[in-house]
Design a protein with these regions (language model features):
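Conserved mixed alpha/beta catalytic, RNA-binding, or beta-rich assembly cores of soluble enzyme
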Residues: 156-167
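ATP/NTP phosphate-donor binding region
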Residues: 1-49, 53, 87-107, 122
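Short, well-ordered beta-strand core segments
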Residues: 50, 71, 157-158
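Catalytic core of DAGKc-family lipid kinases
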Residues: 77-156
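Short glycine/serine/threonine-rich phosphate/pyrophosphate-binding segments
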Residues: 57-63, 165-167
Length: 167
């Protein structure tokens, strides 16, 4: 059997961070906790301020569902996660959120990549978008930018935005 102590410590640290964040945010206004699995179904209000408490992937995933609302990325465990998209610690939430609420914190705009199929379907990504077959086969595709296009054949293409190029 394996040793699960580290997983238990990680979970305990995360649960403590959630509790502290809820306390801090609750003193500043209404709080609605949305789990990652419910994000695709949640409708954010135009005036909502969103706090993502987790790893970088949670920030990138959450951004896909926002339409101009500010998002504050919070690192629940700085000793464990580098958090390129998590500039704040839970202990910094109070002053950071007060700045955000009064509009005193600069916002960083995020560009998204969008892929459109000839079937009319589209897919957006905040960091990286893989375009290709699920299997190891080769695909034929056309890459276009403005009025210029090129035909290609390969196993696929990875398109990275500014967030996707963080490493």
């Amino acid at each position: 059997g394996g040793d699960f102590d580290d997983y238990e410590r990680e979970d305990a640290t995360y649960q403590q961070a959630i509790a502290e964040a809820r306390r801090t945010l609750g003193e500043l206004g209404r709080v609605q906790v949305v789990t990652r699995s419910f994000l695709p179904n949640f409708l954010f209000g135009a005036r909502d301020i969103v706090v993502a408490l987790g790893q970088d992937g949670l920030v990138a995933n959450t951004l896909k569902y926002l339409d101009g609302q500010p998002l504050v990325g919070v690192n629940p465990d700085p000793a464990r996660y580098d958090g390129q998209l998590l500039p704040f610690r839970v202990s910094q939430l109070d002053p950071v959120m007060r700045d955000v609420l009064r509009g005193g914190r600069p916002r960083r705009e995020v560009a998204m990549a969008e892929a459109r199929l000839n079937t009319g379907q589209s897919l957006c990504a905040v960091n990286d978008l893989f375009i290709g077959l699920k299997s190891h086969g080769s695909a034929r595709y056309r890459i276009s930018l403005g009025q210029t296009s090129e035909n290609h054949s390969s196993s696929g293409v990875i398109v990275s935005t500014g967030l996707g190029s963080t490493g």
